[in-house]
Amino acid sequence: MKLRDLWDNPRTRSNLCFSAVIWCSLIVNYYILAFYLKYFPGNIFWNSFTMAFSDICSYLLAGYVLKKVGLTKSIISSLLTAALGSILYLFFFSSVSVIPLFIILCRVGNSMLLNIVYVTNSTLFPTQFAASSFGILNFISHVSAVCAPLFAELPDPYPFFIYLINCVIAMVCSFFIRQIN
């Protein structure tokens, strides 16, 4: 099988295109949070520890949610969690004491989505294209992440406007992907 066969099949082409948008939104948001970490109030080491702990919790939660509600609903629930964190940040970004809670919500939702897209990639494409599609999506998303440091350096609260827009775009695209395996 050739990569051309991946593109010629309407279902896999659709999954590849919509997954690419979801992955790009996800990875850009992931790195916006990573680069924005230096601006969070408090000790950067404690903030990094909190982010890592929230990642562990979100990875465990992602598997449970995916098993209970399926792919599309788990993508939407993780994006809603991330979007809620960014919306709360946009409204209360001047309240320094609650910002870490909003950032944790953003991080949990984003890390849940990261785990979900990695785990379910093999269900969106035939076996012979699973590795190729994974590589294509990883490459495209990380190329798009080049702009994340620029977004993170924008004045407050613009990075979280971009974060929220990415969540909404990914949420819309999640309705168009279909599992085939």
Where are these regions (language model features)?
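C-terminal transmembrane bundle
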Residues: W23-L26, A34-N181
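Flexible cytoplasmic loops linking transmembrane helices in multi-pass membrane transporters
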Residues: M1-F35
